């Protein structure tokens, strides 16, 4: 049997094939990565890898093929994507994927109470957020919540209120993280990147 050289090049995990093979077969690694990307959010316990295909609602609709799709212990769908090529409208695409994952959960006569949150994790090899002040952040989490009470603007603010069923989007911009000294501020995430 030929020996494997320690000088052999490693496969790039940003490659779709490598990413899918690695994380679709190792739910423990996927769980660790998703929790690190989500930062301080409540940790997830992923329990099942799902079919990554989301079929169109009709023959003219868009078919979605995610890199990895999983379910957590509370029935929430976790959609994970790696995107190497820059796309200016990527955040709209990511939101569309989450919305379709939400819509896919129930059929025509099923109760809305069956809906569970959908959490998206996008690992980007480009800078998505480029506005002034955004260059110092490479890890983002967006969720639907009420930041203020519009009917009582003169009152002290209440804590933000999140909806029970969420569309949560997490973005990790790899080029920024390399610049921002992630090795010192978040070593476990740095080791993944």
Give residue ranges: language-model regions:
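Elongated, amphipathic alpha-helical interaction scaffolds
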Residues: 1-193
């Amino acid at each position: 049997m030929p020996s494997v050289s320690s000088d052999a090049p490693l496969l790039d995990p940003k490659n779709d094939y490598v990413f899918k093979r690695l994380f679709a077969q190792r739910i423990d690694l996927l769980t660790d990565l998703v929790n690190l990307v989500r930062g301080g959010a409540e940790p997830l316990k992923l329990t099942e890898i799902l079919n990554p295909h989301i079929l169109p609602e009709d023959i003219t609709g868009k078919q979605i093929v995610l890199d990895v799709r999983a379910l957590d212990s509370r029935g929430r769908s976790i959609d994970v994507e790696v995107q190497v090529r820059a796309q200016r409208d990527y955040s709209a695409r990511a939101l569309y994927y989450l919305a379709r994952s939400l819509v896919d959960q129930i059929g025509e006569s099923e109760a809305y109470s069956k809906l569970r949150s959908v959490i998206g994790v996008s690992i980007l090899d480009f800078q998505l957020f480029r506005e002034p002040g955004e260059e110092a952040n490479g890890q983002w989490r967006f969720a639907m919540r009420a930041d203020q009470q519009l009917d009582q603007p003169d009152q002290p603010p209440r804590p933000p209120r999140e909806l029970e069923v969420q569309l949560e989007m997490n973005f990790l911009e790899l080029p920024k993280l390399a610049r921002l000294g992630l090795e010192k501020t978040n070593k476990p995430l740095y080791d993944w990147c």
